Amino acid sequence: MTKSSELYQKAQQTIPGGVNSPVRAFNGVGGSPLFIERADGALIFDADGKAYIDYVGSWGPMILGHNHAVIREAVIDAAQRGLSFGAPTEMEIAMAELVSELVPSMEQIRMVSSGTEATMSAIRLARGFTGRDKIMKFEGCYHGHADSLLVKAGSGALTLGQPSSPGVPADFAKHTLTATFNDLGSVRELFAANKGEIACIIVEPVAGNMNCIPPVEGFHEGLREICDQEGALLIFDEVMTGFRVALGGAQAHYNIKPDLTTLGKVIGGGMPVGAFGGRKEVMQYVAPTGPVYQAGTLSGNPVAMAAGFACLNLLKEEGNEKRLAAKTKQLAEGFKVLAEKHGIPMVVNQVGGMFGFFFTDQETVTCYEDVTKCDVERFKRFFHLMLKHGVYLAPSAFEASFTSLAHGSKEIDATLEAADRCFAILAEEAK
């Protein structure tokens, strides 16, 4: 038995399921999860001392690679002056100014401690600003575990939302409408059936929680137009895509200006940070200037702000955005070529520094229904084969994978060599 397996058994005695976030339990792929002891650059090292090329990156934040020296020193320096004050600091101003510089639609910004806090607060703000109760999300998109967002579609486009988790009251879920990602017709249909009642649309501009699904041409432009026509706010949930799809986020990549944006992951440089922001007239509704209440003991934590500030300043250095996208494209295209070489049907999607692949005969994968038709069992087999060859992919067929600036030619070449061998095994097993 490996040390990771021993630790997993021990963890289950005091931690529900042995993990502090469900996907870490490897339920999506089977087997025991890796317990990580340390990480550096593009590598993680498990409790048994084995190294893996990492394409999870702590689920997105480690865009510069693990344990970056500059971020580490920024954290140490900040910690030496105090861990938390519960009072404003100058670094909060600097951080807000930097985020606004990189994401100009965020004219004012409120820091929080997680992506879930950011989306939950943005939804409350949209409701308060518009005076409307209903919100619209998309099937297959995830926006954190707030009650109003743990909702799935009913049986038909015009039915009320249904809770996707016990503990979410049906009376609460009924205010959440679910449309089909990349389908403007479903959006218009819901607005027509709920005239003057919808406060906002919240969307992952690149859906990263049903693997990696980019928008089809005109989709985001259509959302912007519909929101303007209907008096609803457009919220881009850039917790995953922010600073990763492009330095200015997916909104810069697709040239769309949302009313509100939520951020997480990369913004903290590895520390727990989230943020929401947008048009000044909307943000002025947030307490203490406005009536929409939001607060947090650790919001704007000085150590976390120092880490995020260091991360974003490094990230904005010239050439980094293009380098990240180029190496991710090289990896994604390499997967596709090798799959074709071995006769493995596969769709590969990639935007900026995120990518995903689907074992499927379909020509494209553009929505949740397409994702559900993919071969999850083959993904599970491929995941474990790659893990055996020292490559750590996202342990779920429904999660995106990520590269970092620390992934060099050596790591990408080694990953593709491993993929070549693993695809060969899959092809042989299919005979």
From Swiss-Prot:
Keywords: Cytoplasm, Isomerase, Porphyrin biosynthesis, Pyridoxal phosphate. Its EC number is 5.4.3.8. PROSITE patterns: AA_TRANSFER_CLASS_3. Belongs to the class-III pyridoxal-phosphate-dependent aminotransferase family. HemL subfamily. This is Glutamate-1-semialdehyde 2,1-aminomutase. The modification N6-(pyridoxal phosphate)lysine is found at residue 265. It catalyses: (S)-4-amino-5-oxopentanoate = 5-aminolevulinate. Homodimer. NCBIfam families: hemL (TIGR00713), PRK00062.1 (NF000818). The gene is hemL. GO terms for cellular component: cytoplasm. Its cofactor is pyridoxal 5'-phosphate. It comes from Vibrio campbellii (strain ATCC BAA-1116). It is found in: Cytoplasm.
